């Protein structure tokens, strides 16, 4: 049984991890003025687009997910031949059209694949499962890493599916934006109310940073802390405590809206690296997706892991 894993480009995972595990990326296109980039999780392309466009006018960006037809074509031209079963893991459907597009495409794919597979010499049926990760950015990485791990172990499709659906319900994605004015301007552009309870002007004047949590599809502020670096340190410290308590998978994903050297220099990051090493947890760090950056702003920090239900505490 050849099992394929598909994610959308909002999923924060390192480029080499994606390549090593043959993870297929559905690109999300970002348009800022006349500049357009289809995000294929290329960190250099993301950083140069960030310098050129996102920092100044990112809040005006329009993001376009892969359409129903594009998803159908990708599957029928490639994936129904390369794989027997595909897991398609998407950003929370409350945040993007991708889940709905993939679901819609799946009906056409399952209708039309047989002659294509037969021509390629495969007589067995093809199946796919679209799973809402109920999360975003670094949080999305957790289910994808687990899918790759279970596939490498030779687990069955049924075992993998059950595990991923359970994991999605227990994945936490924490984020700290660096610039509240940006966040408010972006929310206004999108008509998004989820950051409404933050007074951006007041927050910026007092250097207050919200800690946003994505959990079971919902994104909301769970704390307000002072200063970006102290806030990052508190989030790393909280993650270390969760690692010591025991995570549900041996993985922590970190996404950063800029050069990774800046992430490494943040207070508390070395302690997080040490805790991961001590407890046998894989720390996967990546430049945040372009979609992530235009939505939460340059220099934002995101941390994802799976754990039993808990409240955030600084």
From Swiss-Prot:
UniProt-listed InterPro entries: DegV (IPR003797), DegV_C (IPR043168), DegV_domain_contain (IPR050270)
Residue numbers binding hexadecanoate: 63, 96
Alphabetically ordered keywords of this record: Lipid-binding
Residue ranges constituting the DegV domain according to the UniProt record: 3-307
GO terms of molecular function: lipid binding
Known function: May bind long-chain fatty acids, such as palmitate, and may play a role in lipid transport or fatty acid metabolism.
Protein name from the UniProt record: DegV domain-containing protein XAC3508
